[in-house]
């Protein structure tokens, strides 16, 4: 059984369900496959972002990110796996970045397809129209996101970027739902708190 989440301002191509049915035969044949990742397009047919470098093979979310192939995608999940990874709740906040859940799929791969399954129409006043304001309204959610990413970093540069953002949102967040980072890089996290002013300027 598959699960396909479509945003309220998006719609499907006439043959999207048929395409999903066809792709699912290959996707579900692999035991550690969590579903399908395909493209999104605008109403004029132009693709959102870039086409995948590798079509018809399996990648994890992290693989795609490291290849520079992330971004807006149509994602079809295997329901049995998706049901294990729920969005956490942070009191008083309304937006949780999808990456918090996607990062939990590190042991699962997805069939990659260069077919567009979703037609997207961005709303002028939609959630993503002002990302900085959205993040500032949900500091606990972004504290959690960047906290989890610190140990995932593939390079020191990437890790430092996550730590800077984590420290900023940890300082901004006044709630108690999200615990502080206590991983292997705790000393580095603490030593970089003085750099909060640098990140603060970027959110003004």
What do the predicted segments below correspond to?
Residues 15, 19-22, 100, 104, ...:
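Alpha-helical elements of Rossmann-like donor-binding domains used by nucleotide-donor carbohydrate transfer enzymes
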Residues 163-166:
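Structural register within alpha-helical repeat arrays
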Residues 171-204:
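Membrane-interface aromatic/basic loop that binds lipid-linked glycans or pyrophosphate carriers
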Residues 43-132:
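Conserved nucleotide-sugar donor-binding catalytic segment
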Residues 15-50:
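Conserved donor NDP-sugar-binding/catalytic core segment of glycosyltransferases
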Residues 117-123, 130-156:
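Catalytic core of nucleotide-sugar-dependent glycosyltransferases
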Residues 1-11:
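Short beta-strand-to-loop acidic/aromatic patch adjacent to the donor-nucleotide binding site
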């Amino acid at each position: 059984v598959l699960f396909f989440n479509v945003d309220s301002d998006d719609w499907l191509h006439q043959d999207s369900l048929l395409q999903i049915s066809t792709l699912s035969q290959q996707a579900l044949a692999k035991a550690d496959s969590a579903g399908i990742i395909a493209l999104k397009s605008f109403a004029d047919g132009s693709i959102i972002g870039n086409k995948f470098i590798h079509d018809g093979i399996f990648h994890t979310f992290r693989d795609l990110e490291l290849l520079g192939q992330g971004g807006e995608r149509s994602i079809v999940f295997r329901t049995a796996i998706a049901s294990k990874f729920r969005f956490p709740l942070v009191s008083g906040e309304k937006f949780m970045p999808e990456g918090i859940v996607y990062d939990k799929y590190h042991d699962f791969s997805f069939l990659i397809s260069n077919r567009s399954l979703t037609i997207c129409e961005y709303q002028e006043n939609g959630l993503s129209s002002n990302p900085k304001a959205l993040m500032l309204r949900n500091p606990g959610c972004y504290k959690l996101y960047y906290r989890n990413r610190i140990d995932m970093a593939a390079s020191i540069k990437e890790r430092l970027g996550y730590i800077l953002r984590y420290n900023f949102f940890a300082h901004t967040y006044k709630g108690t739902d999200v615990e502080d980072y206590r991983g292997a890089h705790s000393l580095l996290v603490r030593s970089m708190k003085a750099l909060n002013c640098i990140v603060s300027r970027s959110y003004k």
